[in-house]
């Protein structure tokens, strides 16, 4: 299925372009073990992947939320380079899209310092003309604000853009902003979860995106 109207492609970062799942899970378990010893296991924290840290920790204890976020981020920063990898066909796909003249951006719920660490580690930062992080917005995904900000910075309209992500927050943010949407089947929560939110496309691997936008 080809759609040649797309000129701009926005990507989520964690779980979409780079595999930070083990880092995120380890960071949650480290933090929660400190505040709630023996209460949370690996399977319990999967639901926390996607929402902002504030949303997750404030729902547990509003008074300790900022302290929990600080502990999470410190551990996440320290362990970043040893636990983060790049997904299959990501680099090659971004390279092909860039050479074909597409405008590329990142829309993430992470802070800029850890975003930059991931881009540097994997070498994919060169492909993106804008990177919208949690630092840049008032409302995180699924609110359309970060998607609309990225499009504004790129000089693109929602109708010519596609938002790619591994979480329902990404799909809903794209829909709320008026873009097309693509889910990734390698989401840790399973493609069935993502399919419930009816993305326009589902990618089995990142290179599937090339056919969708008409790159040979």
Swiss-Prot record:
GO biological process, one term: DNA repair
Keyword Transcription regulation: no
Gene3D superfamilies the UniProt entry points to: HAD superfamily/HAD-like (3.40.50.1000), Putative phosphatase, domain 2 (1.10.150.240)
KW Hydrolase (keyword) present: yes
Catalytic activity: diphosphate + H2O = 2 phosphate + H(+)
A GO molecular-function annotation: magnesium ion binding
PANTHER family associated with the record: PHOSPHOGLYCOLATE PHOSPHATASE, PYROPHOSPHATASE PPAX
Protein purpose: Hydrolyzes pyrophosphate formed during P-Ser-HPr dephosphorylation by HPrK/P. Might play a role in controlling the intracellular pyrophosphate pool.
The protein's name in its UniProt record: Pyrophosphatase PpaX
Organism name: Bacillus subtilis (strain 168)
